[in-house]
């Protein structure tokens, strides 16, 4: 949670973070027109287009504002029928995009649709809304009509027929995406369930070695923006000025949001009537499965000297002396269970395909991931029967104050 500093005038401050954009994945066989379609939608040459099958290798992403939806990020993927050893690796990258896809565009072009139907089933299994597009020039549509009608019967929905090479393909695709927009994309907020207009909220934000000079970390920025959107009165302080900040206020804040690592300090000094939470806990609710995280925190008591814990960070950064995930949480666990307790750390999109060797997973707040991606990891943990919790939840549990915080 602490590794993503953003400065006042850099691109991160000007653009909506990808983590809160709607993720739209474009899938299909090689040479089905995926890249051509993306270029038509964005009205830019985002992806290289070639008659040679397999032009797209690693996924290509493009962030943009889509009228009627808002901030989105498109992913153009390698064909899922790619062949050979390199092809297998490309398909694995395509599978990774699947884990964070909110809406899928499945592009059809050939009469043999067996590959596409396998992926359609995979998308439906993951409960991902699917927009099926038949890419064909006008002159070729009659030839494919029987297959298109067969596809409509199999999917139970309308198949959008467009020519991806034409600019006019973008508008019907945009309208179809609006119809598929998941309700939670527009309804969920970070703090909206805890605050109302004119509430006073105090943010306690230690400016330690992990917060680069002149910057706030991304979870703090996103939370401040969310509070302002809800018409709250936002005050802020560092942990060492908490008492002075509280004394300066005319009334106790309704809510105090702190960095998880100073939970005990803030809990001890907060007014009795003020609610307490942390940025990490808020993001556990916003991005993950908060009930599973809370339930899984109890697994900390079941650890022993030979246990193995996986710590997962969404961002990639060089470890620092006060790093909460790489230093502080492992130190807390080893203080209780001994140095022989093994702690593995993964970052970015790295995540084990097999979790069976672990007794517990502790995930960061995932400010760099969208909710779909976090929940795909939670679902994997659930299916393998492995407890999974979150930095803030784990710290609150180990400090004995979990029942006193709000989420």
Model-found features: residue ranges?
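G-domain G4 guanine-recognition motif of GTPases
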Residues: 77, 108-111, 128-144, 160-168, ...
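Conserved G1/Walker A P-loop phosphate-binding module
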Residues: 2-88, 96
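Canonical P-loop GTPase G-domain recognition
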Residues: 128-131, 136-193, 277, 387-397
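Conserved C-terminal guanine-recognition region of P-loop GTPase G domains, centered on the G4
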Residues: 62, 66-70, 89-159, 218-227, ...
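C-terminal effector/interaction modules appended to NTPase cores
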Residues: 5-7, 11, 29-35, 214-407
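Short, flexible loop segments at the rims of nucleotide/cofactor-binding pockets, characterized by
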Residues: 51, 80-86, 108-112, 139, ...
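C-terminal end of P-loop GTPase domains and the immediately downstream helical coupling element
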Residues: 23, 163-228, 233-250, 309-312
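Structural alpha-helical scaffold elements that stabilize or flank donor/cofactor-binding regions
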Residues: 90, 94-97, 194, 249, ...
């Amino acid at each position: 949670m602490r590794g993503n500093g953003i400065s006042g005038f850099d691109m991160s401050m000007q653009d909506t973070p990808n983590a809160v954009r709607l993720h739209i994945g474009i899938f299909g066989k090689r040479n089905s027109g995926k890249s051509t379609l993306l270029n038509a939608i964005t009205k830019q040459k985002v992806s290289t287009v070639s008659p040679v099958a397999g032009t797209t290798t690693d996924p290509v992403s493009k962030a943009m504002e889509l009228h009627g939806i808002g901030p989105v990020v498109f992913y153009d993927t390698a064909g899922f029928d790619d062949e050979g050893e390199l092809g297998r690796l490309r398909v694995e990258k395509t599978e990774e995009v699947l884990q964070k896809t909110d809406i899928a565009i499945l592009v059809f072009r050939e009469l043999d649709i067996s590959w596409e139907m396998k992926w359609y089933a995979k998308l439906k299994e993951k409960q991902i809304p699917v927009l099926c597009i038949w890419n064909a020039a006008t002159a070729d549509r009659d030839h494919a009509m029987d297959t298109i009608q067969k596809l409509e019967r199999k999917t139970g929905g309308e198949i959008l027929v467009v020519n991806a090479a034409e600019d006019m393909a973008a508008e019907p695709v945009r309208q179809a995406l609006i119809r598929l927009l998941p309700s939670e994309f527009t309804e969920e907020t970070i703090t909206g369930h805890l605050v109302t207009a004119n509430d006073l909220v105090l943010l306690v934000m230690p400016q330690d070695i992990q917060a680069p000079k002149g910057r706030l970390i991304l979870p703090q920025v996103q939370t401040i923006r969310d509070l302002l959107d809800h018409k709250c009165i936002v005050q802020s302080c560092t942990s060492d000025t908490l008492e002075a900040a509280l004394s300066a206020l005319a009334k106790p804040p309704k809510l105090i949001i702190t960095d998880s690592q100073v939970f005990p300090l803030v809990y001890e000094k907060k007014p009795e009537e003020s609610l307490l939470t942390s940025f990490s806990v808020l993001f556990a609710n916003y991005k993950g499965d908060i009930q599973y995280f809370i339930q899984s925190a109890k697994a900390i008591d079941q650890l022993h000297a030979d246990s193995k814990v996986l710590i997962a960070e969404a961002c990639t950064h060089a470890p620092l002396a006060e790093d909460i995930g790489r230093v502080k949480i492992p130190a807390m666990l080893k203080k209780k269970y001994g140095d022989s307790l093994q702690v593995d750390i993964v970052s970015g999109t790295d995540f084990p395909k097999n979790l069976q060797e672990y007794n517990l997973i502790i995930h960061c707040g995932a400010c760099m991931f969208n909710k779909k991606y976090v929940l795909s990891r939670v679902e994997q943990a659930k299916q393998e029967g492995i407890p999974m919790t979150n930095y803030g939840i784990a710290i609150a549990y180990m400090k004995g104050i979990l029942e006193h915080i709000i989420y």
